[in-house]
């Protein structure tokens, strides 16, 4: 075999795949946290009043005032707020890395970029 038959090739750069997967995971996580219903169950197995209201029949009466508007967003839960904050900070740090990638020339005249 000749030496020309075996060429070295650079490995496949799969960085963009990981970026897309990370952004997809972040979008799904944020959508899940903002769209889930964390209101308390009020009523019985037939009558549900999660947003407040009144019901009255011959044997029972239910009067439930609406919860405040802030409790509809599940980020007020301590665990979800912490998870969202960590996720947001991670995305901001990761995104700032790509925004700030420029050729930085040192005072000595050399380009010391890592790529």
Curated annotation (Swiss-Prot):
Q: Which residues lie on this side of the membrane: Cytoplasmic?
A: 1-13, 96-115
Q: Show which residues sit on the Lumenal side of the membrane.
A: 35-74
UniProt keyword DNA repair present: no
Q: Name one GO biological process term.
A: transport of virus in host, cell to cell
Membrane-crossing ranges are 14-34, 75-95
Q: Which GO terms describe its cellular component?
A: host cell endoplasmic reticulum membrane; membrane
Provide the protein's localization. Answer: Host endoplasmic reticulum membrane
Keyword check for Protein biosynthesis: no
Major site of localization recorded for this protein: host cell
Alphabetical UniProt keywords: Host endoplasmic reticulum, Host membrane, Membrane, Transmembrane, Transmembrane helix, Transport, Viral movement protein
What is the purpose of this protein? Plays a role in viral cell-to-cell propagation, by facilitating genome transport to neighboring plant cells through plasmosdesmata,.
Q: Which family does it belong to?
A: Belongs to the Tymovirales TGBp2 protein family.
What miscellaneous comment appears in this entry?
TGBp1, TGBp2 and TGBp3 seem to act together for cell-to-cell propagation. TGBp1 is the main movement protein that physically cross the plasmodesma with the viral genome. TGBp2 and TGBp3 would facilitate TGBp1 function.
Tell me the protein's name. Movement protein TGB2
